[in-house]
Every structure is written in C-alpha cells, then in structure tokens.
Amino acid sequence: MTTSASSHLNKGIKQVYMSLPQGEKVQAMYIWIDGTGEGLRCKTRTLDSEPKCVEELPEWNFDGSSTLQSEGSNSDMYLVPAAMFRDPFRKDPNKLVLCEVFKYNRRPAETNLRHTCKRIMDMVSNQHPWFGMEQEYTLMGTDGHPFGWPSNGFPGPQGPYYCGVGADRAYGRDIVEAHYRACLYAGVKIAGTNAEVMPAQWEFQIGPCEGISMGDHLWVARFILHRVCEDFGVIATFDPKPIPGNWNGAGCHTNFSTKAMREENGLKYIEEAIEKLSKRHQYHIRAYDPKGGLDNARRLTGFHETSNINDFSAGVANRSASIRIPRTVGQEKKGYFEDRRPSANCDPFSVTEALIRTCLLNETGDEPFQYKN
C-alpha cells in the first residue's frame, strides 16, 4: 500500500509557522464529496474577514475532471457552501466548509445527494425527525493490514477487543482520542466513541441531529478523521467488510425518531414505521451503500451481528435483525428505533432521505417518488 511520507515530517517545525499571526485574514477549507460518492476532496481559499454564517461564504469552483465528476472538455464544477464548522487543524478563526457540488448548468452533481435530501427534509420539518448514526471504521497500517495486526498472520480471535482496555486489546486509541477532541472543537455533534469487536475497528456516534444536519455533521466528522489519520500516518477505511472471514464487518447503524415517537405511547408510531419499512426492504438496501447494495452484500450475511441482506426482520434488543427496538424503548413505549442495515461507507444523506420517504411520506415501491418543485 503506497502512502504519503508526510506523517514522518517534523511537526514541530510546522508548528513554528502555524503559530504565526494571520492578521484579519481567514482560511476557509472547502470540502466536497467526489464522484465515487465515498471520497472527500478539499481545497482552501483566503477570506478577508471571518464569516458569521454559511450564507456569507462565496461560491467557488474546481476541476471536476480530476474528481470523477465531469469530462475535461467541460470540467468546471461549482462549490456551493452548505454548512460551516470551526477548523480544528488551523484553529479559530479559520473554517471548514462542507459544500454541495453543481454542474456547469447548475444542476446537482450525481453524487450531490444532499440537494434532494434537503427538499425531502423540508417537507416533514413539522415532525422534527431526529437521527443518530453510529459510524464504524477500521484503522489500516501502511502495510495494508489493519493497524497493529501481524504482517503475516492474525491477532487472537474476537472477544476481548470490544470496548477493550490495554495495549493488547486497544489498537490505535491515540487516533480515536485526537479525532474526538477535534470534532468537539469543530462543533460536530459527536456523542461518543468506543472500540469495536474486531481489533483496530472503532466507532464514533454522531447525533442527535435534526433533518439535513445529520448528513452534514457525519460527513465533516469523516473528513476530520481522515485528516487526523493523515497526521498519524494511518489510513481509516469505511469498507463494510475490510477483512473477509470470521471478523465483524463495519456498519453505520442509524437511529431514527419523530416527535410523535418520542412522546407518550410513541411505540405505536415506531411499529407503524417498521411495518412500512418491511414492505420496502430492497429499496432501502440499494440506498444504504454507494454501490446499490453490492458492498453490503459482503457484510449482511446473517452472521457477526448482522441480518441477511435478502430478508427483513425486526425485534426488541435483537442485533441480528434489520431493525432493532432498544429494550428501554420497549419498556417505556416511546423513543426511537435503530436501522442496522446501512453500511459504514453509506452516504448519510441517502440513508436519512430513504427513511423519511418510507416512514413519513408513505412511499411504496422500488423507486423514490419524484415530487414537483
């Protein structure tokens, strides 16, 4: 695996320059999703003053032929700022700016799933949909193996690593802690973190977030993770099954509720939503990974705390079901449910939009309904 040698450079020397005053100028790093639907790209511009809201940020452009988003003969793409965060790498007053991508004709790029998701969220804003997403990922070393694994073998079997403590159980905690603090600084709604079942696999949780902000916060949290890993010389992968065999895959379990579900006797609305989901399983499978279900097919086998990709199931406290109702929700008869099907490399805009379409807009069938503007 070819990796940059940047992590070996002397960070102390860099800090000499990073501590220099920057006057009234502000560095804004524009971030966008590339043509793969998974990769992130970024570039920085100088602003004359600190923007107070995303509306104060200017549009920009980039070469879409170099990001799998256009042909070279007509390659200019537009970057339209959508969400703004504090920059944990350059620190205040500098900014991270998540952008939507538009083509030369001002139509959204194929991987700009935020655009439609925003329209769908606006249609149900009175129901106050909340989301929380549990992002699993695997740390990979420069040798192509999971971080800390033997180059020519495997660690001990799964069991002691989940929420594990100790040098023989926790692989890469420094990266996890750095990412956590960077997210807090940025204003990302990170709710927690833990070591996962497979060694070198970790999870962080984002939420609760209402509506479109779920996707904004998760994508920026992913960007921050990649940048932290860049500094450490380690790679974070969201592949849903990075290691074949008797090892857990990586998902992005999605917790969902509406105002009605969170209030007294909300379990009724939770059960109604699950019934709707049961009739639209294949539509959701296609929406839950960037390859239309092909990535998830390696993960959703019915083993390693997953359901089978071909079957829909639901149950209380059942981590082998498509949909899990937490035990406390069953006892209190209100709260939320967890959709365990999304893959680790899902687009959160696609996942949350699909849940709204099926559960709140009562769509049926294998294709999303096309609403008029």
Swiss-Prot record:
Cross-referenced Gene3D superfamilies: Glutamine synthetase, N-terminal domain, Glutamine synthetase/guanido kinase, catalytic domain
GO molecular function: ATP binding; glutamine synthetase activity; identical protein binding; metal ion binding; protein-cysteine S-palmitoyltransferase activity
GS beta-grasp domain boundaries: 24-106
Chain positions with Phosphoserine modification: 343
Binding residues for Mn(2+) 1: 134, 253, 338
Keyword annotations from UniProtKB, A to Z: Acetylation, Angiogenesis, ATP-binding, Cell membrane, Cytoplasm, Disease variant, Endoplasmic reticulum, Epilepsy, Intellectual disability, Ligase, Lipoprotein, Magnesium, Manganese, Membrane, Metal-binding, Microsome, Mitochondrion, Nucleotide-binding, Palmitate, Phosphoprotein, Transferase, Ubl conjugation
A GO term from the CC aspect: cell body
N-acetylthreonine: residues bearing it: 2
InterPro entries, alphabetized: Gln_synt_N, Gln_synt_N_sf, Gln_synth/guanido_kin_cat_dom, Gln_synth_cat_dom, Gln_synth_gly_rich_site, Gln_synth_N_conserv_site, Glutamine_Synthetase
E.C. numbers: 6.3.1.2, 2.3.1.225
Binding site for L-glutamate: 246-247, 319, 340
Cofactor requirements of the protein: Mg(2+); Mn(2+)
Result of changing residue 209 to A: Reduced ability to mediate autopalmitoylation
PTM remark: Acetylated by EP300/p300; acetylation is stimulated by increased glutamine levels and promotes ubiquitin-mediated proteasomal degradation. Palmitoylated; undergoes autopalmitoylation.
Reaction(s) catalysed by this chain's protein: L-glutamate + NH4(+) + ATP = L-glutamine + ADP + phosphate + H(+); L-cysteinyl-[protein] + hexadecanoyl-CoA = S-hexadecanoyl-L-cysteinyl-[protein] + CoA
Effect of residue 11 to R: Decreased glutamine-induced acetylation. Decreased ubiquitination and decreased proteasomal degradation
Bilayer topology: Lipid-anchor
UniProt function note: Glutamine synthetase that catalyzes the ATP-dependent conversion of glutamate and ammonia to glutamine. Its role depends on tissue localization: in the brain, it regulates the levels of toxic ammonia and converts neurotoxic glutamate to harmless glutamine, whereas in the liver, it is one of the enzymes responsible for the removal of ammonia.
Disease link: Glutamine deficiency, congenital: An autosomal recessive disorder characterized by variable brain malformations, encephalopathy, severe developmental delay, seizures, and decreased glutamine levels in bodily fluids. Death in early infancy may occur.
Family: Belongs to the glutamine synthetase family.
Annotated protein name in UniProt: Glutamine synthetase
Gene: GLUL
